[in-house]
């Protein structure tokens, strides 16, 4: 009887030890898998970070190179045109009296003369292979002051100026696009040339200077970054 009891206890202890052994082995396997999963995720995140850093550097280099090219081409003309080039390569025409009559969308003669000189040279630079492949949009933006005659509400002022700024931007686009000197670029321009009216959404410190036209280059960097961010969602840590 005692012998049978001892055998039963021995079997039970052996069973318990086997259970602990299985638990230990399972835990080790789970830990190893978790470590491997973590290693893979960290590697993917590192690759994503390197890709984003590369895009940011390429964008910064491209922006600087384009800025230097624009400044070299138009540096002597900016004062004559009362224009400026911002660090983001926005070219701003600042003199409202030269651009349009108050409340009118028609491009004035003096501004047409400026565009005749400016736009073909501008497009020629942007169409260079080192810039063209990175350009998402060439955008003409119309901006206004916060004034709208006979307006009694913010809504009336904003919507009136939105309509006017859009009409002005479109008139500038139409004039530029109809220049015969850019005929060889038109197929490309159809894909990237845009006109936007922003009303007084982006005012300058001087309300009169807020009445302006800007030429902006939008690169593909943002789209590339968004693609990478979408991919990164698959590797978020749980």
Q: Model segments located where?
A:
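Short edge beta-strands and adjacent turn/loop segments
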Residues: 77-93, 136-138, 144-146
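Periplasmic peptidoglycan-binding/anchoring modules of Gram-negative envelope and division proteins
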Residues: 71, 104-139, 173-178, 223, ...
């Amino acid at each position: 009887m005692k012998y049978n009891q001892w055998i039963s206890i021995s079997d039970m202890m052996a069973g318990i030890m086997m259970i602990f052994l299985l638990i230990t082995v399972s835990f080790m396997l789970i830990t190893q898998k978790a470590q491997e999963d973590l290693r893979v995720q960290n590697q993917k995140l590192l690759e994503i970070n390197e890709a984003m850093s590369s895009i940011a550097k390429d964008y910064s280099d491209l922006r600087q190179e384009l800025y230097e090219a624009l400044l070299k081409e138009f540096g002597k003309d900016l004062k004559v045109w009362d224009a400026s080039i911002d660090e983001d390569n926005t070219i701003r025409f600042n003199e409202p009296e030269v651009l349009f009559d108050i409340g009118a969308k028609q491009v004035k003669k003096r501004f047409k003369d400026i565009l005749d000189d400016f736009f073909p040279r501008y497009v020629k630079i942007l169409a260079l292979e080192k810039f063209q492949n990175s350009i998402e949009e060439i955008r003409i933006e119309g901006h206004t002051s916060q004034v709208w005659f006979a307006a009694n509400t913010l809504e009336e002022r904003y919507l009136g100026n939105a309509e006017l700024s859009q009409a002005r931007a479109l008139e500038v686009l139409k004039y530029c696009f109809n220049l015969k000197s850019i005929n060889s670029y038109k197929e490309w321009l159809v894909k990237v040339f845009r006109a936007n009216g922003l009303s007084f959404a982006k005012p300058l410190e001087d309300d009169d200077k807020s009445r302006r036209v800007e030429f902006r280059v939008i690169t593909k960097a943002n789209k590339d970054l968004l693609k990478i961010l979408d991919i990164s969602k698959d590797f978020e840590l749980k």
